[in-house]
Amino acid sequence: MKKNIIAGCLFSLFSLSALAAIPAGNDATTKPDLYYLKNEQAIDSLKLLPPPPEVGSIQFLNDQAMYEKGRMLRNTERGKQAQADADLAAGGVATAFSGAFGYPITEKDSPELYKLLTNMIEDAGDLATRSAKEHYMRIRPFAFYGTETCNTKDQKKLSTNGSYPSGHTSIGWATALVLAEVNPANQDAILERGYQLGQSRVICGYHWQSDVDAARIVGSAAVATLHSDPAFQAQLAKAKQEFAQKSQK
């Protein structure tokens, strides 16, 4: 009898663990304006990604080399772009892609596309990265070296937030993939902009190169998951229709 009880308890424990693969946090049930997906729908980045490079490994030496390369760019025009790219809040992600997309992506000029991008931002930036970030709690470059980033606005808050994978990069790459689907004629410029958003995190000192590389995988997986969500599908269709109408003018 005792064995059956213990076995039942263990089964319940492991079943709950399997269901709770993604750590608890905000999702579509708590912030529907920033998420399409619920916790249980999200990809598990901890299972998807390999561990981050260990200090002293060849991969980490590459991270350090890329950090130094990025640091040397901070006083250049590319460095200024990295500083601006650090702020993706309050429509910042839409603004970042407006040039590559071909016209302003704003709530006024393209409301359906703007809603699509702002509503998916944390599906890619938070939900898709959460399990790996919280498990590894990798130290960020600026904290590792005890230096400042190129944009110190979020430095204190992010000093206690895991570096691997990069949430900003996941947002940028996921956004680029979706925008390239809406406007395939500009896909090269859009994808290049999405790639550079990730590199801006290395230049700024907020992330290691391996954080950024991993985040592009996570961002791609997040977009694949979003395409199975009816609410996302509906808003994507509206954005495509809006774009088609604007293109005819």
Curated annotation (Swiss-Prot):
It catalyses: a phosphate monoester + H2O = an alcohol + phosphate. The keyword Transport does not apply. Its main location: periplasm. It is found in: Periplasm. Keywords: Hydrolase, Periplasm, Signal. Pfam families: PAP2 (PF01569). Optimum pH is about 6. It is an enzyme of class 3 (hydrolase). GO terms for cellular component: outer membrane-bounded periplasmic space. NCBIfam families: APhasePhoC. This is Major phosphate-irrepressible acid phosphatase. It comes from Morganella morganii (Proteus morganii).
